[in-house]
């Protein structure tokens, strides 16, 4: 019985060690499709635009010195019209810490985050906004996935549910520079971006008019939708 107790304790110690090993986080991780990756292929800070991947997915990157970046591209169900799903793209970066209890806390650079919400079957515009969302993960675990035989990252959210598993794609990580990329000036600048249309669901095809809004106002996103093609007007 004593030996069994030590055996169980050893397993628990191994698990905690794996969960709390910050060095294991380092790299770029992506969900199964591996089409969504952090870095310049998802967000172009010079043109200030999000670049749509071929498939939906999630990606996180972490550095050894406490910086992170994330990229989301998701389809949102439309209960009132299942044939018209909405799409959302989100990008942000900032710093992270892991506390003594193994809790992972992500703090984004407030002015840099971006979100694009599109709905092809509703009104005449989509909304491109600043996006700022701190995140807390109760735990993380890195291990070799027995099926795919690659390193896997499991993130447990603040409500104890788990995100979709992510798999290691790059180490060192593929990321944009970790400093502020879009410092806010007192004067507003307007830019015009032309986009061609090819289909009815791809986000780049759904955007007719996009606006960078004050982050305090982005809760109104649900009131605005998207139509096909045209010019994009971005305010920063």
Curated annotation (Swiss-Prot):
What's the source species' lineage? Eukaryota, Fungi, Dikarya, Ascomycota, Pezizomycotina
- Family statement drawn from the similarity comment of this UniProt entry: Belongs to the ROT1 family.
GO terms, biological process:
'de novo' protein folding
Q: Which gene encodes it?
A: rot1
Originating organism: Aspergillus terreus (strain NIH 2624 / FGSC A1156)
Name of the protein: Protein rot1
Keywords carried by this UniProt record: Endoplasmic reticulum, Glycoprotein, Membrane, Signal, Transmembrane, Transmembrane helix
Can the keyword Signal be found in this entry's annotation?
A: yes
Membrane-spanning residues: 218-235
Membrane topology type, per the record?
Single-pass type I membrane protein
Lumenal face residues: 19-217
**Residue ranges, Cytoplasmic side:** 236
